[in-house]
A protein has these predicted regions:
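A polyanion-binding, active-site-adjacent surface
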Residues: 1-167
Length: 167
C-alpha cells in the first residue's frame, strides 16, 4: 500500500461513528521522509471542510511558532490520532481512537520520523515504536488561550528546534 492509497482509505473511512458527522476523513500531510512527525487529537471544522490537518486557528498558530524557531511546515509530517472531526470538537472516545490507530501506525511506518511530537493529552495514545523519540508538547489551541501555557509551548518548540539542529 502506498501513502496515496492510505490517504484515500482515510478520506472515505467509516470504521467508527465519527464519519456520520464529517464531510470526510482527514489524512496527514508532509514529506514522506520528514524527520519530525506531529500528532494531534483530531481534525476541527476547518480541517474537515478542506480535508487537511492543522489549517484552522491552532494550526496557523503552530505553523507560525514553528517558523519562528526555524522549523518549516513543509519539512514536517502532521496528522491526528483520530481522522474525523468529532461532535462539538470533544475528545475522541477510546473506540474511535482504536479504529484510527492502524492508520496512524501505517503513517509512522511510511514516514519513519526520528521524533514524534505529541500535541496535547489525547495524542499520548500514539503507539510507541522502537527507535523513535517521542516528546509531548502543549496543544497549540491551549497555548493560544492561556498565557502560561503559551510560554511553555514556545519553550517546548525552542527545545525541539535545538534537538533538530543537533541531529
Amino acid at each position: 500500500m502506498s501513502m496515496e492509497e492510505l490517504n484515500a482509505q482515510i478520506y472515505i473511512c467509516k470504521k467508527c461513528r465519527l464519519w456520520q458527522g464529517a464531510k470526510h476523513g482527514v489524512p496527514g500531510e508532509g514529506p514522506s521522509n520528514a524527520k519530525v512527525m506531529f500528532v494531534g487529537q483530531n481534525p476541527g471544522a476547518d480541517e474537515d471542510e478542506l480535508g487537511r490537518p492543522f489549517i484552522g486557528r491552532a494550526g496557523k498558530y503552530l505553523t507560525k511558532t514553528l517558523l519562528e524557531y526555524g522549523i518549516k511546515r513543509e519539512e514536517i509530517f502532521i496528522t491526528n490520532i483520530v481522522k474525523h472531526v468529532s461532535p462539538q470538537n470533544r475528545k475522541p472516545i477510546d473506540d474511535e481512537v482504536r479504529a484510527c490507530l492502524p492508520y496512524l501506525v501505517t503513517q509512522i511506518k511510511f514516514v519513519k520520523p526520528k521524533i514524534i511530537v505529541l500535541l496535547g493529552a489525547s495524542a499520548k495514545k500514539t503507539p510507541r515504536i522502537e527507535g523513535i523519540e517521542y516528546t509531548q508538547v502543549i496543544h497549540p489551541s491551549a497555548a493560544m488561550r492561556f498565557t502560561k501555557m503559551r510560554e511553555k509551548f514556545r519553550q517546548q518548540i525552542a527545545e525541539l528546534a535545538n534537538r533538530l539542529q543537533q541531529n
